[in-house]
Amino acid sequence: SIIALGRLEKVKDSDQLIQSWVNSKERLEIIGSGPEEQKLTTLIHDLNLTDRIKIVSNLDYNSIEGKYKTASGLIVSSHREGGPRVLLEAINHEIPVLGSRVGMIPDLIPSECLSEPGDQKSLQALLEEMVPLLPQLNMEGIKAALNENYSLMSAAKKTKEIYETLLKANS
């Protein structure tokens, strides 16, 4: 199944994800808990999507790892995001990602895999076009770029370069 993982709060736009899923035949698991959980459960029921969308809450780390290992894709529908960490975890597991153009998502994901944040029509168009293609998306190159640009060694090297630049400027 395809997963969406995160705290169930307004900023994640899980309601738009659910509304955008109406034409999809795939199974979606929204993994997380939070203040929007009951509202989202009601929305799934009201849209007659209970056979395709499930909310799974209160999973421990090993259970979430298991979800990554069996997922065919990850969707990040947030309208505001710092990272998100789930993006890095999915790429590390070589899971194709579809997401909003927020945080570092556009830096790591091809533009054809992006929707406009907070725009339900954009998200629905993305899902209808790209969900059937998820098995064909190759994440190896993205994982290599991630390891090159976001590894601990890379971060240490960049930090060292910043310090060296600052030291040169002060001397």
Name every feature range the model reports, one short phrase each:
Residues 135-170:
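A charged, aromatic-enriched C-terminal amphipathic alpha-helix characteristic of glycosyltransferases
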Residues 41-59:
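Nucleotide-activated donor-binding/catalytic signature segment of Leloir-type glycosyltransferases, i.e.
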Residues 96-99:
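Short hydrophobic beta-strand element within catalytic cores of glycosyltransferases
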Residues 74-75:
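A short hydrophobic beta-strand element within the catalytic core of glycosyltransferases
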Residues 58-59, 66-71:
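Short alpha-helical donor nucleotide-sugar binding micro-motif in glycosyltransferases
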Residues 3-23, 35-41, 88:
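A conserved mid-protein helix/loop that constitutes part of the nucleotide-sugar donor-binding site
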Residues 112-121, 128-135:
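Conserved acidic donor-binding segment of nucleotide-sugar-dependent glycosyltransferases
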Residues 79:
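Aromatic "clamp/platform" in nucleotide-sugar-dependent glycosyltransferases that forms part
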